[in-house]
Amino acid sequence: MKTAAVAFYGAALVLLLAALKELLTGFEENRCSMTYMFEQPEYRRVVLPRRVSRLFPAYGLYLYGEGVYAQETRNLKLSGTPVLFLPGNAGSYKQARSLGSVALRKAENMEAGLHLNVFTVDFNEELVAFYGGSLLRQTHFLHECIKAVLRLYKNLKVPPRNVALVGHSMGGVVARALFTLPRFNPRLVSLIVTQASPHVAPVLALDPYLLEFYVAVRQKWSTQAQKLRNVTVLSVGGGYRDYQVRSGLTSLPCPPGDPNKLALVATAVPRTWLSTDHLSIVWCKELVLATVRALFDLVDPETRQLTDDPERKRAVLNHHFVRHPARTPQDAADPSVSMPDVPEAWSEVNTLRLSYRTPKEGQLKYFLFALSSRRRAYSHFYCRSSSLESSSWVLGCVRTAGSSCASAVDLSSGTELLPPYKVLVLSLSDLSSFTHLVVSASNLSGKQFTVECEWQREAAQTLSVSVPHLLSFGFSVGEVTVNSSGLLHQVQLLHFHQVYQAFRISVVSSCRGNADRLPSVYRLRVPWFREDSFTTASVPSASEISGMLHTSRPGNFSNVLLQLHTAPNCQYKVSIRTSFPKVLGQVLRFCGPMVPVYTAVTLLLACRGQLCSILRSGRAADMMQVVSAGLQPHQVLLPVYLLHVLLSCSCLQDISSVLGLPPEDTLPPTFPDGVEGAESHEEWPHLLSPLLYVLGAAVAFWGSALLRLLIRLVSLFLAPLHRPSVSRTSGTLSLQTQFLLGVCLYAAAWMFCGALAIFTSCLLHLYRVLRLQMTERSLGHMLNLAPNKRKVTANGAPEAEPQSGTSPRGGAPLLSEGALQEVRDDLQLHLSLMPLLILPVMLSAPSLIHWSRNLRFSTRLDPDPWWLHSVMLASVYLLLINATVSKLSISRLLPVISRLPLPLAVTMATFSSLHLYRLAYFLEAVLVPLAFCFIF
């Protein structure tokens, strides 16, 4: 193998490892606080009807409890508001303990005994993210659970009519799938909260049932959106720490403008402001508190049920998850405020900026800002306070009395909570009915805080900077300097609108003097999706922000903004550089499913190279040589792009639909679902195809090298268990044995699981490869020990070496280099085929795991997406066990079969980027004809 090939694939491996490192570790540390249980958690099993238990023996329903509450609810006599937790992929029903424990602690402080009854569903920790055959079964069981939960309250005077669902991961998708059931009453569920749930598309589509399930859910929520308008759905993504489900997939597929469907990222949630991984989003205290507070605020105290008022549900969820005004929703009921008539408490501010720190002693203090003299020169009024207590702190004065305000209207509802303080920005054009603004700085409790306010011109506070080009590799930099004469500045990041862009944004602050200042807050604001991120920094300091997007910008939205809540009299220097490792991480995050597709493409072309070598010379080439030659972008990517252009034509789309051909496969969209102006197809993944092909080829190359090494090592351990053999037929099967094994494998596929038959037949072929490796080693050792002397004829020439399998004077056959070469050829052929044979095993592994974990409930996998595949693949594996280069080289089918891999590779790259399970069809299209070569 050439050194250049090793160097190239070594560099490709470095790129892949850099992308993986950035994807798995290139984010902030886990800043979530742990939720603790103060008493022993208990899970009380709810007895379900016998019919339900018989239909779903692997599933269960439990009530969460602790301490005294667990004892009080032992008989399941309940009076609270029902909340049902749904675990996700491989999730445990015990994950509800964080939600249940915090809800119990919250109920201790509630009046009138309001509390939540948290139920949790046991889905047997099934791998539903990769095996979709159980999703519909889980949906039906959830329907039965809801009916069983509501039956527990039938003795109450006013029993609850619906439940709230909290779903983690695939549990959130199952919650929305409830509405696809023909007998489901939509009134049974009025609120769904999902955590890190991939609503847009599955992370990996490894079987058709998974995609069929998603299509049914999307179609239901799209076609009957008006009927489901009163169902409130909140979807929370984890952010960049969640590398399993990217946050763009958590957006909700719904019509634009539906106010009852809300999707956001945890970094944008008030009082959370952090990223969570896929598991910690369930127990992250900051997020659990927001969820529990919202659930309690949604309970009607009179009926003890979740409110049916869509306006109230929307207001509560916006309050806790979108824009927290540092006050409770009940405080905003009456905006009219009577002001105290205490002249010494009032001060009129005539300067452009106010900076005030309250004394340690409690006092009443109000500042009065006249509006009449500021309307023409300024556009906004900005104010912030480090007091996070709930209060009416900014008011519009309606009637003045001397130097004080007699009557005012509360304007604090527009307050936004930031990590270190609360902020309010008022547009002067909206304040025409007021004469003055009043800012309250009263600290009757004696707790010190700081208030800073100023008049602002929005145009003067907004700057623009173009981000560097993607291929600048960090050498070019976009810079802007903010000489802070104000408290708020905005920097528009021009041309930053695609998910494959990634930047390191550095903000360096320097100040004059050593005065105490409030910390600065840097907010990366994305207008088209709630994925804002916040960075808090002391002054002076140097901070670095990761500039990346979870979603691409639709066409009708403004630019990304970097908001700087700054300290006065300080200078801020903003530098933006492209981060190549982060770009690689983004490429893998959004286009990762294409890597295994191009790995399969490389292995197919490697098989083509091996077949062409046998056809041309009758000898098998080295496995690593043909795999290294499998990277042929000019023969694959150009036809793929031409197919993409052709299939984009409407006339060809009509023809393909008439012929029943599938549409071109595309990755899930990166635009937020349900946003106007989003394009249906994106072109940038085609531009990244060469990079993805290189990464896929690197996986194929180094994976094949690892497989070759493992086969050598395993054969060393197995050699003492086998008698040394010098025959190339070692490990082969007789026709009768092949027939018996085939019958057993078909029976296993029918009675148990198709993936089991595929896995077993692959092991049989692996054993053949191991025996060939042992034979090759034995022959090599024997030939090295044999004497090298040759007899000399009468004319002085050396006597010709006997052919393999012949012997002088009719004796036993002598070993020769020819015999060793034949074994080596067969070994290289099988080594080249082995990665292709392993791919279906890897694709079917989730089905096999699901079947093995459910053996105590059912011995047969139903439905089985791999049953038909197992019949063909098991037959192919058994036939290929006896494959030899000599048989293949004389086959009349070889010239035709050697031409199949290239068009199949092009078709595979076109139609398998989303439907990964289609890889099996293309592999069978090559392997089945190849197996026929050893029959005819």
Predicted regions and their residues:
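Classical eukaryotic N-terminal signal peptides for Sec-dependent ER targeting/secretion
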Residues: 1-13, 630-631, 732, 896
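Membrane-interface motif at the C-terminal end of an N-terminal transmembrane signal
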Residues: 14-40, 219-227
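Short coil/turn segments at secondary-structure boundaries
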Residues: 22-33, 95-102, 131-137, 177-181, ...
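Short, surface-exposed "cap/lid" segments of acyl-processing enzymes
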Residues: 24-27, 32, 62-128
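Serine-dependent carboxylesterase/thioesterase catalytic core
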Residues: 84-90, 104, 108-110, 116-244, ...
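Eukaryote-biased recognition of electropositive, low-complexity segments
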Residues: 188, 204, 213-224, 228-348, ...
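Preference for solvent-exposed, low-hydrophobicity sequence contexts
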Residues: 328-590, 598
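Alpha-helical transmembrane segments of integral membrane proteins
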Residues: 573-936
